């Protein structure tokens, strides 16, 4: 049997570790960019973010407190996915990793820093805002880069233009992103997550307003997931019952019928089913911007899902039912 050389095995392990980390970042969806002048406040900030539903942070090396802050968070919040940002030198890489950082983020493309991280298997997301930097990142074996400064560099429109020639490249835009434009960036499926500091503002940290940080984090998560009622499903035991009910709804409200293989939609908001779908009385479909991401955040709240009900299209999860019924109705997520 032919076995791969050790260097290829080692490289494979590094790539797998990087992919696993980026997959988790993608599920979290938001990477708070934290600037700390006082390392003693680091744990309180991290716990506030976790309380708000974000278990990830990028602590920047813009201050002398960064290394100690990372160390404090890594020790007290082991479930936090912790990165080091604004890393400019290989010495800072060593300091960050020694303190407990799990990934490195740089503002620009520094070949020395990138190659150093790649050689040591340290996940890195380098800043790139043009094709030259992107091609250097690809040559280094990376498939995810930071688009920075996102808004100043042209926003989503520029991001889509950059992504065009690089079909396998993904982005983590940062810079000028806030609660109002977050959804626009995340709607572009080449974006794995967005970085931002709006939920960890300087004044909130200085005033020890950790409840305020938690609230802004929670609001950001809800904006990102964008939950909304899509339709209500009515259970029946036969296609005849389905046809009769759909016809009656059309007679009363004028909602045109849209027939499918197992149900009829009487408008977009009412699904009349010709068989017993999950739910004693029926089901309620909750739309979301990203099913995988929504599952991740809801599972952290203890919500259980029926894995057998998963539906995919082109590799993306489109829908899945919760195990729990509420008021005799099943609930399922649907990606919209």
Task: Show where each model-derived region lies.
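Conserved N-terminal beta1-alpha1 strand-loop-helix module at the mouth
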Residues: 14-99, 119, 179, 207-222
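N-terminal beta-strand motif that seeds the catalytic metal site of vicinal oxygen chelate
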Residues: 21-35, 221-246, 279-286
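Catalytic beta/alpha-barrel core
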Residues: 33-35, 56-63, 80-88, 101-109, ...
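Glycine-enriched alpha-helix->loop->beta-strand junction motifs that scaffold or abut catalytic
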Residues: 50-55, 76-79, 98-104, 119-125, ...
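Catalytic cores of alpha/beta
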Residues: 89-99, 132-140, 177-192
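Glycine-rich phosphate-binding active-site loops on the catalytic face of alpha/beta enzymes
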Residues: 107-113, 146-155, 190-212
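Amphipathic alpha-helical segments
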Residues: 239-253, 296-302
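Vicinal oxygen chelate
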Residues: 269-274, 299-336
């Amino acid at each position: 049997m032919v076995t791969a050389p050790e260097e290829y095995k080692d490289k494979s392990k590094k790539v797998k570790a990087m992919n696993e980390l980026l997959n988790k970042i993608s599920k979290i969806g938001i990477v708070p960019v934290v600037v700390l002048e006082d390392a003693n406040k680091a744990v309180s900030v991290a716990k506030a973010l976790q309380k708000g539903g974000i278990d990830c942070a990028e602590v920047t090396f813009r201050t002398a407190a960064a290394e100690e802050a990372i160390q404090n968070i890594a020790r007290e919040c082991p479930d936090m996915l912790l990165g080091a940002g604004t890393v400019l030198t290989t010495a800072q890489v060593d300091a960050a990793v020694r303190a407990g950082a799990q990934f490195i983020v740089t503002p620009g493309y520094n070949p020395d820093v990138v190659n150093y991280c790649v050689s040591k298997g340290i996940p890195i997301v380098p800043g790139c805002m043009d094709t030259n930097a992107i091609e250097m990142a690809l040559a280094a074996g990376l498939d995810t880069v930071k688009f920075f400064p996102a808004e100043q560099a042209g926003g989503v429109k520029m991001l889509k233009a950059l992504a065009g020639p690089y079909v396998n490249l993904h982005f983590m835009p940062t810079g000028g992103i806030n609660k109002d434009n977050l959804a626009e960036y995340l709607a572009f499926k080449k974006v794995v997550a967005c970085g931002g500091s709006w939920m960890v503002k300087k004044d909130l940290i200085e005033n020890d307003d950790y409840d305020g940080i938690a609230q802004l984090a929670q609001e950001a998560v809800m904006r990102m997931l964008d939950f909304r009622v899509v339709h209500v499903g009515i259970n029946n035991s036969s296609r005849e019952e389905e046809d009769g009910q759909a016809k009656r709804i059309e007679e009363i409200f004028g909602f045109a019928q849209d027939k499918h293989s197992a149900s009829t939609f009487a408008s977009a908001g009412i699904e009349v089913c010709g068989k017993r779908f999950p739910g004693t009385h029926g089901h309620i479909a909750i739309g979301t911007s990203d099913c995988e991401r929504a599952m991740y955040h809801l599972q952290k709240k203890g919500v259980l899902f029926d894995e057998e009900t998963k539906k995919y299209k082109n590799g993306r999860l489109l829908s899945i039912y919760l195990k729990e019924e509420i008021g005799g109705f099943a609930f399922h997520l649907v990606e919209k």
